[in-house]
């Protein structure tokens, strides 16, 4: 993209020339009015970082599974007319997921939900001692991660003293006046606490700011001090390149309902590095038993080698099958091509937003209606841009968000003051990016006019 701002004609032309433009036709685009808009027609859906859209083949796959349930019932576990027997429903997904996260197939499991998987892995790999018991986590982490991490030191009250439990969490905070964490500041915290840290827990992409963490620089320091590195990849998988093996990450969890379009509250997954020892601490369930003997109903647990040995219950069919359609589509188009298009889409959104008269600069007068972008510049981000709606102290964000929604732009709000916009490669367009910026400006202009009355 040149330094000149693209015109509407440019945006239409880019869509026409886009080699991936056909993938939009694979998805069902929501109706604006059904989403709270004032007019009928397709919404501009920039909320795939919260819930991805329905793939048309996913609808087909779900209907097929309903038919199997109807006609074959329990025998669908073993004999399946579409060659997806339910007892092996995760197997077609594993190769795709492993490739997507940069891992070996035996290191990946497809099961449960993100926080439950997080608890599962922390139970095995958080093994505090008198000298090494602390967990590093960002202060602004997603609340479920924050709650989960805080709960684990309390489970070790036979090993840890009350004062150790009270001081088990090291919370990373940005510098004063900044919105995101600097890598050098994270490394300093690790150095300053090198003898007491057991686990470093970070997101790959931060849910609120959209920051992509430099894991390749952080991981060596984590292991140098003798700690383990765990990642929350909820906003990373399907959004940015993931290289868990290359980065030497110890364990990770993710969900599939955002960029992988598996549906509301769909199934999660996790990764465990080959060779990572759990010290005999494992929460066992029959789906973690060796698949060759699982249905023998033996009282003796024989874990499946690798990550699948940490599964508990059988794989939910109806929250797994929708995932297959998007994984197959990603394989067809090539994830590297998606990353390149995402760079252009989000870069265009950023450029147009920064050219807006409502983009607030530090030198602008205090109290001005507008927004600032707190998401880092490329390459330290994925598709998401987070806009802080100003002035923050006047809490105008909900009104601006509602105006945007009524005009047909579906983003999402994160209290206290952020609106997140995420143009997703598989179904959003450059023309939509241009219109989205216009809607942001219209919503802010209405707020500005209301203040003058």
From Swiss-Prot:
GO terms for cellular component: cytoplasm. Its EC number is 3.7.1.3. Catalyzes the cleavage of L-kynurenine (L-Kyn) and L-3-hydroxykynurenine (L-3OHKyn) into anthranilic acid (AA) and 3-hydroxyanthranilic acid (3-OHAA), respectively. Pfam families: Aminotran_5, KYNU_C. Homodimer. Belongs to the kynureninase family. It comes from Cryptococcus neoformans var. neoformans serotype D (strain JEC21 / ATCC MYA-565). Keywords: Cytoplasm, Hydrolase, Pyridine nucleotide biosynthesis, Pyridoxal phosphate. One of its GO terms (molecular function) is kynureninase activity. Its main location: cytoplasm. PANTHER family: KYNURENINASE. One of its GO terms (biological process) is 'de novo' NAD biosynthetic process from L-tryptophan. Pathway: Amino-acid degradation; L-kynurenine degradation; L-alanine and anthranilate from L-kynurenine: step 1/1; Cofactor biosynthesis; NAD(+) biosynthesis; quinolinate from L-kynurenine: step 2/3. InterPro entries: Aminotrans_V_dom, Kynureninase, PyrdxlP-dep_Trfase, PyrdxlP-dep_Trfase_major, PyrdxlP-dep_Trfase_small. Its cofactor is pyridoxal 5'-phosphate. Pyridoxal 5'-phosphate binds at residues 114-115, 142-145, 232, 235, 257, 286. This is Kynureninase. It comes from the Eukaryota. It catalyses: L-kynurenine + H2O = anthranilate + L-alanine + H(+); 3-hydroxy-L-kynurenine + H2O = 3-hydroxyanthranilate + L-alanine + H(+). The modification N6-(pyridoxal phosphate)lysine is found at residue 258.
């Amino acid at each position: 993209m040149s330094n000149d701002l693209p015109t509407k004609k440019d945006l239409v032309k880019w869509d026409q020339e886009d080699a991936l433009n056909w993938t939009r036709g694979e998805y069902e685009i929501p109706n604006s009015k059904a989403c709270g808009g004032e007019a009928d027609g397709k919404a501009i859906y920039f909320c795939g970082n919260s819930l991805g859209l329905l793939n048309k083949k996913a609808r087909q796959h779900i209907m097929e599974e309903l038919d199997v349930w109807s006609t074959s019932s329990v025998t669908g576990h073993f004999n399946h007319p579409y060659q997806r027997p339910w007892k092996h429903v995760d197997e077609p997904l594993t190769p795709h997921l492993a490739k997507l996260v940069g891992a070996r197939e035996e290191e990946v499991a497809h099961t449960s939900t993100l926080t439950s998987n997080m608890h599962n892995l922390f139970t095995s790999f958080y093994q505090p001692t008198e000298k090494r018991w602390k967990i590093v986590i960002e202060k602004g982490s997603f609340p479920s991660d924050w709650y989960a991490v805080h709960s684990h030191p309390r489970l070790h009250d036979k090993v840890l003293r009350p004062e150790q439990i009270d001081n088990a969490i090291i919370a990373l905070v940005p510098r004063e006046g900044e919105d995101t964490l600097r890598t050098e500041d994270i490394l300093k915290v690790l150095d300053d606490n090198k003898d007491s840290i057991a686990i470093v827990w970070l997101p790959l992409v931060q849910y609120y700011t959209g920051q992509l963490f430099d894991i390749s620089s952080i991981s060596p320091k984590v292991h140098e001090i003798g700690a383990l590195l765990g990642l929350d990849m909820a906003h990373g998988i399907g959004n940015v390149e993931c290289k868990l093996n290359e980065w030497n990450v110890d364990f990770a969890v993710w969900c599939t309902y955002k960029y992988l379009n598996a549906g509301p509250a769909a199934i999660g997954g996790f990764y465990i590095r080959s060779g990572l020892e759990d010290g005999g601490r494992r929460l066992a369930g029959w789906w973690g038993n060796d698949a060759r003997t699982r249905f023998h109903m033996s009282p003796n647990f024989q874990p499946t080698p690798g990550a699948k040995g940490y599964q508990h219950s059988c794989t939910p069919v109806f929250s797994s099958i929708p995932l297959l359609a998007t994984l197959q589509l990603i394989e067809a188009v090539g994830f590297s091509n998606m990353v390149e298009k995402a760079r252009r889409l989000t870069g265009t959104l950023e450029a147009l937003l920064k050219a807006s008269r409502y983009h607030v600069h530090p030198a602008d007068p205090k109290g001005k209606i507008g927004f600032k972008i707190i998401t880092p510049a490329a390459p330290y981000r994925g598709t998401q841009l987070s806009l802080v709606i100003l002035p923050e102290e006047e809490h105008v964000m909900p009104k601006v968000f509602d105006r945007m929604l009524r005009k047909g732009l579906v983003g999402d709000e994160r209290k206290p003051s952020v609106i997140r916009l995420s143009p997703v490669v598989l179904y959003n367009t450059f023309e939509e990016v241009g219109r989205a910026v216009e809607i942001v400006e219209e919503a802010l202009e209405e707020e500005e006019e209301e203040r003058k009355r």
